[in-house]
């Protein structure tokens, strides 16, 4: 009888551990990455990686990380001296609110006009924060500027994930500050496949 009870406890513990591990890679949340599956049909999101900065029962919002634009940030911040020489280019953050600009910065907390997304990565849509961070000549060099964002209504993203159109991964800074935008999507898609395979062994 004790043996049977022990087996039951082990099975329950193992099941709970598997569920917990699986939810880490399937449950969306702020600070998670969305990696578009090969089946993605929406042309705006084909081969994209999105960093979620907001997620709730009312909807979700994120930034497309791997769509750099051939436009220098100095075009929208001409008042910042020396910005053109930094070769910092704008990124297409998504199809919603194309007139809104966002900053992702890794480093010290910029203050109450910025939100922490994960670890020491912060997001802000405040112009004064952007001007200060972009104007630094030393210190926080890891930053990107985005125009627009990706948005989902209540339950919409969950349906897309359930339909297999997105893979959910924990965020890391490599996905943001990549060296080759043409390779980063495939790298994270492969990583997702490996993680999913490890969960079903």
Residue ranges and their predicted role:
Residues 4-16:
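Bacterial N-terminal signal peptides
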Residues 20-201:
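A short aromatic-anchored loop/beta-hairpin motif
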